[in-house]
Amino acid sequence: NNIPLLQPVKLNDTEFVEKIQSLNPDIIVVVAFRKLPKSVWSIPKHGTFNVHASLLPQYRGAAPMNHAIINGETKTGITTFLLDDNIDTGSIIMQKEVEILHTDTLEDLHDKMMVVGADLAVETIDRLTAGDFTAINQETIIGSDTELQPAPKISKEFCEIDWNNNTVDIYNKIRGLSPIPAAFTNIKTANGNVLSIKIFKTSNEIAKEAKGNHSEKLSNNKKNMGNTNKD
């Protein structure tokens, strides 16, 4: 389709900025990308908006879907918002909720959010070009008692299971990191070797137990793996 592909090392590079300016874009759409400098996001006449995988202002950051599942949320959503100088703090254009089932993994949620996000992006473009929207400043919906949940980048250390945690927390962590980057644990073999094992899912029975009772144990799993958890 003869669409130009630009991959600058530095987003504020003069040549890159001038190239974007020469394209004279009406709108710039950002999805899962690093922070754009003002020299870029201020170019389009209808603005630059981001498609973010949470109901902002909750879960600002690089891994909103992971952290929503890990924290046991039952809903999340997609937010489109106008870019500003900070990360995920711009004025909200549109939002749409997405249910998180108790058995949803990151992959399951991603597939649902992908469809909703695409539709919301198209609707947002239509509203921006028509001027049919009222941007909502995020600060106006953050109350004095609002506890904002962050969504920082997932580190390798974060992925290791802490068996001192309760069943629900362990279960949510496994599904919130599945399939990538995946939760893991280390076990020692009979000959003294230490193996690192990735865990992609737990049984449906554990899911049912964890949903109703935080004190239930991962009895079968912990025996097989040589681990015990807090419960």
Language-model features: where?
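One-carbon transfer enzymes
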Residues: 1-181, 193
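An anion-binding loop in the catalytic cleft
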Residues: 158, 162-231
